[in-house]
Amino acid sequence: MSGGLSHVPVLREEAVAMLAPRADGVYLDGTFGGGGYSASMLEAASCTVWAIDRDPAAIARGAALAARYPDRLHLIEGRFGDLLALLRDRGVTALDGAVFDFGVSSYQLDDPSRGFSFRTDGPLDMRMGAAGPTAADIVNGYAEAELADILFHFGEERASRRIAAAIVRRRAAQPFETTADLAAVIRTVVRPDRSGIDPATRSFQALRIEVNQELAEIERALEAAASLLAPGGRLVAVSFHSLEDRIVKRFMNAATGHVAAPSRHDPSGLARQAAAPRFRALTRGVVTPGEAETVANPRARSARLRGIERLAA
C-alpha cells in the first residue's frame, strides 16, 4: 500500500461520544478500515475492542495499533455480516456497543489496484476482500437485463437500460478489463449534467454494491449486532448514500417500535421487530458532519449518523 494513502474516519468524535465507551466494556468496530474508531474507543476508556474487516490489507495495517493495545484490541478478518459467528467462535457472546461505518475505505478508493474508482485507471475489481467475483466478472458475464436491474436498483441510475445495452455491445467485441475502459463506455451514454457529478458515479456504486453484496451484509450486521447488545448497549451506524441510510433508518425505526416496511433482502426479519420495542433512539433524525469536517474531508458531506440503545430486559 502506498505511503501516500490515508483514511479519515467520518463523524468519529460524534460516533464515539454516542457509543460512550466505558471501562471494562466490550465493543465491536464492525468496519475497522484505518482503525480510527477503534483507536478512539481504546483511548476513551479502558475497554476491549473486537474489530472486523474483510480486507486483508486493513487487518495488516491494524497490526501496529493492536501492538499498542495487545490485550484490548483483537482483529478479525471476515465479513461484518458474519459477525455473530466470528465473535462467538472467539467466546464473545455479549457486547456493550457496536459501531459501523458503511462507507468505502479511502484506502480502497485511492488505490488504483483495487479497482473502485473511475478517476484513476486500474483493474476492474471492486472487491473489498480477496475472494468472490470481480466487477469485470459481472460486466462481462451478466445478462443485459440483470445488469440493467443492478444499475437501476443499486445505483438509482435512470439510464440503466441504455448503459447495460452499451456494455453488452462493447463486451461482444472486447471484454472489459479496466475501470477507465468501463467509465469511458458509460460516458458515451450518460452526459455530464450541471451537478458536476461524473456520469460513471452511479454505475460504479451499483457494481461495487453487487460485487460485495453490501446491502444484504448491512442488514445481517445490524440484526446480529443488535442481538448481542447487553441492556444499555448501543448500536451506532454511519451511512453514506440513500440506499444504506434507508436500511439503517428502517432497522432502527423497527427496533424502537416504529412500524417498518419489510426489506426486499429480508422480507420478514425487520418487520418482526415492530411489535415490541427493544431499543430507544439516540438521535432525533440524523447527525451530519459540520462545515469544518466537510471542508477538511469532502467525502464526509453525505454521511449520516444514527444510533439506538438497548432497553433493560
UniProtKB/Swiss-Prot annotation:
User: Which protein family is it in?
Assistant: Belongs to the methyltransferase superfamily. RsmH family.
The reaction(s) catalysed by this protein are: cytidine(1402) in 16S rRNA + S-adenosyl-L-methionine = N(4)-methylcytidine(1402) in 16S rRNA + S-adenosyl-L-homocysteine + H(+)
A Gene Ontology molecular function term of the record? rRNA (cytosine-N4-)-methyltransferase activity
The answer on whether this UniProt entry bears the keyword Magnesium reads no
The protein in question is named: Ribosomal RNA small subunit methyltransferase H
Enzyme Commission code? 2.1.1.199
Q: Which UniProt keywords apply?
A: Cytoplasm, Methyltransferase, rRNA processing, S-adenosyl-L-methionine, Transferase
What GO CC annotations are associated with the protein? cytoplasm
Task: Please cite one Gene Ontology biological process associated with this protein.
Answer: rRNA base methylation
Taxonomic lineage of this organism? Bacteria, Pseudomonadati, Pseudomonadota, Alphaproteobacteria, Acetobacterales
Q: Which Gene3D superfamilies does the entry link to?
A: Putative methyltransferase TM0872, insert domain, Vaccinia Virus protein VP39
Q: Which Pfam families match?
A: Methyltransf_5 (PF01795)
Query: Which PANTHER family is this protein grouped with?
Result: 12S RRNA N4-METHYLCYTIDINE METHYLTRANSFERASE, S-ADENOSYL-METHYLTRANSFERASE MRAW
